[in-house]
Regions:
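Short polar catalytic/cofactor-binding loops
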Residues: 9-14
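Conserved catalytic cysteine-centered active-site region
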Residues: 2-5, 17, 54-108, 115-172, ...
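N-terminal extracellular/periplasmic Venus flytrap/periplasmic-binding protein-like
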Residues: 191-210
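Short, well-ordered amphipathic alpha-helical segments that serve as non-catalytic structural scaffolds
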Residues: 23-38, 64-68, 175-176
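Beta-strand segments within the central parallel beta-sheet cores of soluble alpha/beta enzyme folds
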Residues: 6, 41-51, 78-84, 108-112, ...
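Phosphate/pyrophosphate-binding loops at sites that engage ATP/ADP/AMP, CoA/4′-phosphopantetheine
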Residues: 31-45, 179-186
């Protein structure tokens, strides 16, 4: 089997960045990744671009990767746009690796880009998240999440996606409550996970919380 190596990596700083766009964030990441790999854009033979929310929140659709990568100096090559929810980035990487193993290319680029902070468009953001569920069963899904740990969640906090929260945040909270009830997990144990993560982020100049 062909041995595949990741020659360079990069990411933008984590944060809300209201003035940035998917295109501008992509340009930052691609430029830094090429520099890390020690190659120029001319070496790239194909690219995979993963994203899920840009069509709904920025209006850029159908050719997301082509537009973003052109601004980053990458064009005139095959570009595949990948959308697969939270697995979009890993799916793009897998597809790129498969293409290399098939002997189609030697040097490729994989990009995962997302921007979900639009404070002036809360309803659009909420709708974008709900698009990651079965939209034909929204009421059933809301009820399932609300009832998952109904006896453990105060009544005024029940209801998926209420009070400006993401539907998925409510799902995770319900699952955490259910785990605590089932296995005796404590708040202190969950807090230890957060403390560990914050300890790591203190050493990462690109982390949102330092």
């Amino acid at each position: 089997m062909t041995r595949i190596c990741i020659a360079g990596t990069a990411m933008t700083a984590m944060g809300k960045q209201p003035a940035a766009s998917v295109k501008s964030l992509t340009a930052q990441a691609v430029s830094a990744a090429l520099a890390d790999a020690g190659i120029d854009a001319g070496r790239i033979e194909a690219a995979w671009f993963s994203n899920t929310r840009q069509p709904m929140l920025e209006g850029q659709n159908t050719i997301r990767g082509q537009i973003a990568l052109r601004a980053a100096g990458v064009e005139g090559i095959p570009v595949s746009n990948v959308e697969n929810a939270c697995a979009s980035g890993s799916t793009a990487l897998w597809q790129a690796a498969t293409a290399i193993r098939a002997g189609l290319f030697e040097t490729v680029l994989v990009v995962g880009a997302e921007k979900m902070f639009f404070p002036d468009r809360p309803e659009a953001v909420a709708a974008a998240f709900m698009g990651g569920t079965d939209i034909h069963r929204i009421d059933d899904i809301h009820a399932a999440v609300s009832n998952l740990a109904a006896g453990l969640i105060p009544e005024d906090l029940r209801g998926a996606g209420t009070a400006g929260r993401s539907f998925f945040m409510d799902s995770y909270a319900a699952l955490a409550r259910l785990h605590m009830q089932t296995f005796g997990t404590t708040q202190a144990q969950l807090a230890a996970v957060a403390a560990k993560n914050h300890d790591h982020s203190a050493h990462n100049p690109l982390a949102q919380y330092r």
